[in-house]
């Protein structure tokens, strides 16, 4: 039984990976990135999440390696703390309490026991760079209140701050100003570019800055796409700068290589540019990276780069400008038109992704599985261009079919509308376009749904539109003369007094179709397409419509724009009950009778879980989110929970996810955020908490078979070998972090000694009597050996202190031959 705990709202993934620059480990094996309240540690080779560092109570705003120990990581947050982590083991070492909001973090090897952070001044839009001294203490929580002012009136973005020439100076940019602070002189030089007010069409605004690691050179990016290289900036009057120009739009980020021989730049062109020797002639390109480059990072070893993109993606790039790995998070589109769907096959969350794409996102591993290109056109990044939007999507026939709707409307009278139907192909394990229908309706499509009844003989799709009609589309096999191809055709067109059709849905058994026409709900027979009855409460236009399920399949629910939730009984064709509730999201659970409704109020969003047969809610939780909730979906559980409390039983078979206006993906759980967000590799344990890797699933059965054969062999040989998992030396060898292990010579001797057999295992008394005749002979020889052993012991007790040298007896030779026959191949499996 599950221990009863309070249900809490937890973030289940989808946080921004591109919020801050990613940071490489010293050996380039790991990459760290900010993800909401957490810091995620990814492998640069496998792209898998190795650790999730959780402990901050607010948004993490900066991460940096500890310059004095490259196996440790600093992080800062809006919660006013700086935390020190051991990222190898995922352990929090120490917390420094600063006490004010921290917006960025910087470290310098030259500044011992100090870090640099960006904090708020008195006014909310004015920030300053300060140095924080980290006191040495044995306690895990330490107050760090000693702040030293460095620079004032700076930008809060860490891209606008850079330390140069091994910490000799720090540069900061804001608007049209460049400030350089020299630590030894404790002086500040300021440089100004002409503003757009003084020069026509000028876009000299600073957007980012980077400093040469060993020379006095500052690179600044600008709104007009230019890169300026500043030199001789020790003198306010004799400074010089040169321009590099390739980007047609603003420069988003800059980064020097470790040696400083090349400069990396990126922007909205989705192209990484490498300026070698900082000249116009020597530049290399890595194009088609898929989205705007937000950040650029360089590994301390210099062998890897990485770019963070606006589509919540991190690309790891080799020194020769070849992409080697992609870490893709939940893509946050400008607006989610399709809502949240669940792919019946993969149980992946499906919603709008990149422009014109559907993204399939794994809720278990918090990573994107793949993208499906729906529009199949090249995306042009232009602010004034009206793009084709993917507005609707729905799965049908248990994942065998996918329907999508795309539209583009430049003027009210110029509507481009397309509906596409995709068939799942088992060979390619993906969706293939089957039918494309131009202008399926004369106006925008408001809803579409499949008939997903188990007994449905023919796939059926219904679309509703503002043109006042709903259309029924069926799959036919007469699309060519050979009848080998299938396609979708319109089978029926229905309307109700030319009202706009706003919603549609099928009953659980597929026998009825409900279509809402503004304030009126109509019920149609799905066989004859005859109108059965209508419901009209005049409570406003129907916003949401759904049938009850299982024992509540006789009920139909509708939520109106005026804040009324209605429940109709289909058997009596009458209103069962209604409630005043401003429902923004209403989703039925596919595995139970429960329905989740999220209402919007001036304070925030509230959750109500109820059954249509009972107007009293099963569960109510106020204030699940301060912002507006846009979409929700139930996801069936692979392994049901076993909550006994009536208030929590709605979570037994399915889990409810919802998406807020800021596109934060949240869910309800009794587990803490740490337990909820622990990666799969930490949940599946094997062999004393060793993580289950993909190789384990490939070789696991083979290992088990080998172990079984080994056990049989050992039983036949009647020799009891020690269990390796119970040997402290081996456990210590396998579980101790590599950086704290002793030398290999010491480990080797300790390991070999731990495998040696004790004399007790060779005792003749432990050998059964019902063995074969050969073993009985050996037992007689062992008696002689015991006599010989007693003589040797008597001799050794004479106190002479000399080594006794003797020849092996026949019984000893037989015993050695016996050990030669033992299969020691199990050692190789360690």
From Swiss-Prot:
WD repeats lie at residues 4-43, 47-86, 90-131, 145-184, 193-231, 237-276, 279-318, 324-362, 376-423, 430-474, 487-525, 529-569, 574-611. Pfam families: Beta-prop_WDR75_1st, Beta-prop_WDR75_2nd. Its main location: nucleus. Residues 769-787 have a biased composition (Acidic residues). PROSITE patterns: WD_REPEATS_2, WD_REPEATS_REGION. The modification N6-acetyllysine is found at residue 466. GO terms for cellular component: nucleolus; nucleoplasm; small-subunit processome. One of its GO terms (biological process) is rRNA processing. One of its GO terms (molecular function) is RNA binding. The modification Phosphoserine is found at residues 664, 672, 779, 782, 796, 811. It comes from Homo sapiens. The keyword Aminoacyl-tRNA synthetase does not apply. It is found in: Nucleus, Nucleolus. Ribosome biogenesis factor. Part of the small subunit (SSU) processome, first precursor of the small eukaryotic ribosomal subunit. During the assembly of the SSU processome in the nucleolus, many ribosome biogenesis factors, an RNA chaperone and ribosomal proteins associate with the nascent pre-rRNA and work in concert to generate RNA folding, modifications, rearrangements and cleavage as well as targeted degradation of pre-ribosomal RNA by the RNA exosome. Involved in nucleolar processing of pre-18S ribosomal RNA. Required for optimal pre-ribosomal RNA transcription by RNA polymerase I. Keywords: Acetylation, Isopeptide bond, Nucleus, Phosphoprotein, Repeat, Ribosome biogenesis, rRNA processing, Transcription, Transcription regulation, Ubl conjugation, WD repeat. Residues 763-806 are annotated as: Disordered. There is a cross-link at residues 123, 427, 676 (Glycyl lysine isopeptide (Lys-Gly) (interchain with G-Cter in SUMO2)). InterPro entries: Quinoprotein_ADH-like_sf (IPR011047), WD40/YVTN_repeat-like_dom_sf (IPR015943), WD40_rpt (IPR001680), WDR75 (IPR053826). This is WD repeat-containing protein 75. Component of the proposed t-UTP subcomplex of the ribosomal small subunit (SSU) processome. SSU processome is composed of more than 70 proteins and the RNA chaperone small nucleolar RNA (snoRNA) U3.
């Amino acid at each position: 039984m599950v221990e009863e705990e309070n249900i809490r709202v937890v973030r289940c993934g989808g946080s921004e990976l591109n919020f801050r620059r990613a940071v490489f480990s010293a050996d380039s094996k790991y990459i760290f990135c900010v993800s909401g309240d957490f810091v995620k540690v990814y492998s640069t080779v496998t792209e898998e999440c190795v650790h999730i560092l959780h402990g901050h109570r607010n948004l993490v705003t900066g991460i940096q390696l500890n310059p004095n120990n490259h196996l440790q990581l600093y992080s800062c947050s809006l919660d006013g703390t700086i935390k020190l982590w051991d990222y190898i083991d995922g352990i929090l070492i120490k917390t420094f309490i600063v006490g004010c909001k921290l917006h960025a973090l910087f470290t310098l090897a030259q500044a011992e026991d100090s870090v640099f952070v960006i904090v708020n001044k008195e006014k909310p839009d004015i920030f300053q760079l300060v140095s924080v001294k980290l006191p040495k203490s044995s306690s895990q929580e330490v107050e760090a209140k000693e702040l030293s002012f460095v620079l004032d009136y700076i930008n809060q973005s860490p891209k606008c701050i850079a330390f140069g020439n091994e910490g000799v100076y720090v540069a900061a940019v804001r608007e049209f100003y460049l400030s350089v602070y020299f630590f030894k002189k404790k002086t500040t030089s300021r440089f100004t570019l002409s503003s757009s007010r003084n020069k026509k069409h000028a876009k000299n605004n600073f957007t980012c800055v980077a400093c040469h690691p060993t020379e006095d050179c500052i690179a600044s990016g600008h709104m007009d796409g230019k890169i300026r290289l500043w030199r001789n900036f020790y003198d306010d009057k004799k400074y010089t700068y040169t321009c590099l120009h390739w980007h047609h739009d603003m420069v988003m980020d800059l980064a020097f290589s470790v040696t400083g021989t090349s400069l990396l730049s990126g922007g909205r062109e989705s192209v990484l540019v490498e300026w070698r020797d900082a000249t116009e002639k020597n530049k290399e390109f890595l194009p088609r990276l898929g989205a705007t480059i937000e950040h650029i990072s360089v590994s301390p070893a210099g062998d890897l780069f990485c770019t963070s993109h606006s589509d919540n993606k991190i690309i790891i790039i080799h020194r020769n400008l070849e992409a080697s790995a992609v870490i893709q998070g939940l893509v946050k589109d400008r607006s989610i038109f399709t809502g949240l769907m669940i792919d019946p096959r993969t149980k992946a969350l499906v919603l709008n992704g990149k422009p014109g794409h559907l993204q399939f996102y794994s809720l278990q591993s918090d990573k994107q599985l793949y993208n499906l290109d729906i529009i199949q056109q090249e995306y042009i990044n232009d602010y004034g261009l009206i793009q084709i939007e993917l507005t609707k999507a729905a799965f049908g026939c248990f994942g065998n079919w996918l329907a999508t709707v795309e539209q583009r409307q430049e003027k009210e009278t110029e509507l481009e509308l397309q509906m596409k139907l995709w068939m799942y192909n088992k060979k390619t394990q993906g969706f293939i376009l089957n039918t494309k229908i131009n202008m399926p309706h004369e106006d925008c499509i408001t809803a579409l749904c499949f008939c997903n009844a188990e007994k449905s003989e023919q796939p059926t799709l219904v679309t509703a539109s503002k043109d006042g009609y709903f259309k029924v589309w069926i799959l036919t096999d007469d699309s060519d003369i050979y009848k080998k191809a299938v396609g979708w055709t319109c089978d029926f067109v229905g309307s109700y007094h030319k009202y706009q059709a706003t919603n549609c849905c099928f009953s659980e058994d597929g026998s009825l179709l409900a279509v809402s026409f503004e304030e009126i709900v109509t019920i149609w027979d799905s066989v004859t397409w005859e109108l059965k009855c209508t419901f009209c409460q005049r409570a406003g236009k129907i916003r949401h419509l759904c049938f009850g399920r299982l024992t509540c399949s006789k009920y139909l629910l509708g939520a109106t724009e005026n804040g009324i939730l209605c429940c109709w009984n289909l058997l009596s064709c009458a209103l069962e009950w209604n409630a005043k509730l401003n429902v923004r999201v209403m989703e039925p659970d596919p595995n139970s009778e429960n329905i989740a409704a999220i209402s919007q109020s001036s304070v925030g969003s509230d959750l109500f879980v109820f059954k249509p047969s009972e107007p009293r809610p099963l569960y109510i939780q106020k204030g699940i989110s301060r912002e507006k909730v846009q979409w929700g979906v139930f996801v069936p559980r692979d392994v049901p929970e076993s909550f006994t409390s009536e208030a929590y039983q709605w979570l037994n078979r399915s889990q409810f996810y919802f998406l807020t206006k800021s596109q934060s993906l949240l869910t309800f759980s009794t587990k803490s955020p740490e337990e909820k967000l622990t990666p799969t590799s930490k949940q599946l344990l094997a062999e004393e908490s060793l993580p289950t890797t993909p190789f384990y699933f490939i070789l696991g059965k083979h290992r088990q078979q080998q172990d079984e054969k080994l056990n049989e062999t050992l039983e036949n040989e009647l020799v009891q070998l020690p269990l390796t998992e119970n040997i402290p030396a081996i456990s210590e060898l396998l579980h101790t972090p590599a950086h704290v292990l002793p030398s290999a010579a010491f480990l080797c001797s300790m390991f070999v000694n731990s495998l040696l057999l004790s004399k007790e295992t060779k005792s003749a008394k432990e050998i059964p009597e019902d063995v074969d005749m050969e073993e009985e002979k050996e037992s007689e020889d062992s008696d002689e050996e015991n006599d010989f052993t007693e003589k040797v012991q008597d001799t050794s007790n004479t106190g002479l202190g000399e080594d006794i040298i003797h020849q092996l007896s026949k019984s000893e030779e037989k015993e050695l031959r016996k050990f030669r026959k033992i299969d020691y191949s199990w050692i190789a499996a360690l």
